[in-house]
């Protein structure tokens, strides 16, 4: 017999929906927005590394990094 906990009772409805697909777009727009924001983040990091994005008072001298 499985132990019944308060947390298990709270999470039970989420497990009951397992395998069901919501018709329509669902959370696709949120996922797309998250991917775009992550891409922008990566581009900013790349530009800082490549020194094509200059930030005041931030010295990017990799020779003296250690």
Swiss-Prot record:
This is Photosystem II reaction center protein H. Gene3D superfamilies: Photosystem II reaction center protein H (1.20.5.880). It is a single-pass membrane protein. Keywords: Chloroplast, Membrane, Photosynthesis, Photosystem II, Plastid, Thylakoid, Transmembrane, Transmembrane helix. GO terms for biological process: photosynthesis; protein stabilization. The chain crosses the membrane at residues 29-49. It comes from the Eukaryota. One of the components of the core complex of photosystem II (PSII), required for its stability and/or assembly. PSII is a light-driven water:plastoquinone oxidoreductase that uses light energy to abstract electrons from H(2)O, generating O(2) and a proton gradient subsequently used for ATP formation. It consists of a core antenna complex that captures photons, and an electron transfer chain that converts photonic excitation into a charge separation. It comes from Thalassiosira pseudonana (Marine diatom). GO terms for molecular function: phosphate ion binding. The keyword Hydrolase does not apply. The keyword Transmembrane applies. Pfam families: PsbH (PF00737). It is found in: Plastid, Chloroplast thylakoid membrane. GO terms for cellular component: chloroplast thylakoid membrane; photosystem II. Belongs to the PsbH family. PSII is composed of 1 copy each of membrane proteins PsbA, PsbB, PsbC, PsbD, PsbE, PsbF, PsbH, PsbI, PsbJ, PsbK, PsbL, PsbM, PsbT, PsbX, PsbY, PsbZ, Psb30/Ycf12, at least 3 peripheral proteins of the oxygen-evolving complex and a large number of cofactors. It forms dimeric complexes. HAMAP family: PSII_PsbH.
């Amino acid at each position: 017999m499985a132990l019944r906990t308060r947390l298990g009772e709270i999470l039970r409805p989420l497990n009951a929906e397992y395998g069901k697909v919501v018709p329509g777009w669902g959370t696709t727009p949120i996922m797309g927005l998250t991917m775009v924001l992550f891409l922008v983040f990566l581009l900013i990091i790349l530009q800082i590394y490549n020194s094509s994005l200059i930030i005041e008072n931030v010295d990017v001298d990799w020779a003296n990094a250690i």
